[in-house]
Every structure is written in structure tokens, then in C-alpha cells.
Amino acid sequence: MTKLAITGATVYPISRPPMAGATLLVGDGKILAVGRVEIPSDAEVVDARGLHLLPGFVDPHTHVGLWGEGDGPPAYDGNEWTSPTTAQVRALDAINPFHVSFADARSAGVTTVQTLPGSGNPIGGEMVVIKTRGRTADEMVLRRPSGLKGALGENPKRLHGQNHKRMPATRMGVAAVIRQFLTRARAYDPEKGRDLGLELARKVLDREIPLRLHAHRADDILTAIRIAREFSIDLSIEHCTEGWMVVDALAEAGYPVTLGPMLGGRSKVETANLTFRNPGILEKAGVHVSLMTDHPFVPIAHHRIQGALAVREGMSEAGALRAMTLNPAEMLGVADRVGSLEPGKDADFVLWSDHPFRARARVLATYIEGQRVYEAKSLS
């Protein structure tokens, strides 16, 4: 077994407090030990004194590899807008593993992402959790399926009601489409004819995967909770821009939320109440919070900046780091593999020149499963 020892860094395991002057020992793509570690004589040693070592960031809501950037509408593979319910489509089938966004992710210290269909349809399709390196999309997969994407609010109203003059054209219609689809899934009998979309929906009803609902506005957030309770399903609330306005309801419901994108203007009516205070307010109320970029809508390279601004506006530093690592890993069902630096987990980690929330901090090296996949300068 080839071993690698990163020595002398300030290590942030996330699952426990930071450790100064610690060592991370890895071998065969896994973490072997963290802390005061006896270094094997045959290990390759990287002297990381003065550096900061963290788990790779986990971005739980992106369109990395799926959504064109700078190449126009023909490359927008995020929304299969031909029908309001498209649970049968799979994000995996549209991922371009050679897309520049994967290199951007690695250079920003993001080693795991969930990539997913867009929010044009009330029922959008199958989501997938992937690592940000690999020669094929299948090689990247960490969990599939990781959820069923759905959407409330303005996007499905506009795309279907306004643009195509069909249901849904109102918030009532959007919720009705979702309810009707889940009701059909309850009655699904594969012996009467196979339906890939209803098969996925049955996984939601059986609580094998969650329904992940796009909801910015407070009333849409409450509708998401209402639907999840009606069908006794697992839910994550995506965006949750006005979550701070219904924080008590979120805390009582107990569903995880994924906040963002926050680094940008209030470009749509649903983001009129966007604030960087949202993460801190929800954290203090005990809500399970993760942060997202929604790449490319906030470039994945700016993920750490959102965390820093959340801290400035009231979130704890430890909470913000957790919201970018272990919390999303837990919410995505992959915390046994990624999200913290613990023995037995994948050796996905990042060496930073400073704490990642400091303005001048930069990624010096990114490792995925013990292999260096990005390097800013020589460290050995």
C-alpha cells in the first residue's frame, strides 16, 4: 500500500475541533489516521506547516457538467421542458465529464457535487451525486439516484403557463401537478406496464430517496412542507431564500435545507428578500443547513465566498464550514464516504494557504481519493 502523509498543517476534521500541527495519513484512496500520527517509513511526506487542511467541499445543488456556459441555448441540457412531469430523465445522461466546470470545481476545493435537472418542471428528473474527477460520467458517480428534483413557484409557472399555455400556470397548478404525479405513483403497478418516472417516484414514496423541491418564497416553502407531510416522504428544500421568514415552521418540520445561490443580485421576484443573514438565522434555530452555488448561477469557484459572507452576517464559522462539507454529505446520503476527515472515509481533501474564509486564501492542492487532481504550486 502506497501511503501519503500530510504533516504539520492545521487540520479541520469538521466532525471534531481543528487540530494545529497535525498529520493526515492516507493509503489506497482512504484516510488511515488523523491527528498525532506515527508516520510509516515508506510514506511519501508533504510538509504542510503553515497551511490549512480541510475536507473537499461538497456542493449539494449544481448543474456542473450539465449546463452550458458561454455556448448558448443549444448547450442548455438542464430542463426537459416538453412536459411538466419528467421524472424519467436522468441528469447522468447529460453530464459532460470534459466540461471546464469540473476543473473549476477542483481548483476551488470542491470534490463532490450533486448535479441535477433545472427547475422548469414541477417534476424535473433524477439527480446524481458525483466526484469532480473522472474520465466518464459513470466513473464519477458516488450515489445514483440521489433524489427526485421538483420545483414550486415562478419557474414552472412561466415555462409552462406563460410560454406554452398549458398547466401549470399558477401556484395552485404547480402543487396540483406534483400531488397528482405522486398519487399516480402510489397506484403504479409495473406488471401493467413499466414507467421509469413512476419507478423513481416509488423510491420517493418508499423513502429510499427524497423529493428535493425548489422553493424560494416563504409560501412555497410551506407548500413543500405540506406536500411532504401529506405523502409521508423525505424532503429537502432547495434555495429556501425566504426561510428566515418562516424559521419556526422549518425548525418544527425538521427537513434539511440547501441555501443559495446568495452571491448575486435580486434578479427575480422570488429573491426580493435575499439576505446573507438567512444561514445564521436558520442555524441558530437548529435547522440542518447546507450551502450551494447552483453553478453556473454562482460560479463554483466562489463557493467559499458565500460561506465567508454567511459568517460575517451571523453564522458561526464552524457552522459555515460544516454547511459546505459534512452537512451536505449527510443530506445527500454520502457521509460514510465524504464530508469530514475521519479514518475509513475517502481521502478527499484540500490544502489551503490560509483559512478558506480569508480573502487572500487560495487552494494549493486538491486530492480526490488520495490522488492529487489540482496543484497551484509544488509542495514537496
Label every model-predicted segment.
Residues 9, 24, 29, 50, ...:
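Divalent metal-coordination and catalytic microenvironments
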Residues 128-226, 230, 296:
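Metal-coordinating catalytic core of metallo-dependent amide/deamination hydrolases
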Residues 51-117:
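Metal-associated gating/positioning segment near the N- to mid-region
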Residues 91, 154, 188-275, 290, ...:
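Active-site core of metal-dependent hydrolases
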Residues 68-95, 136, 151-159, 203-205, ...:
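Active-site gating loops and adjacent loop-to-helix segments of metal-dependent hydrolytic enzymes
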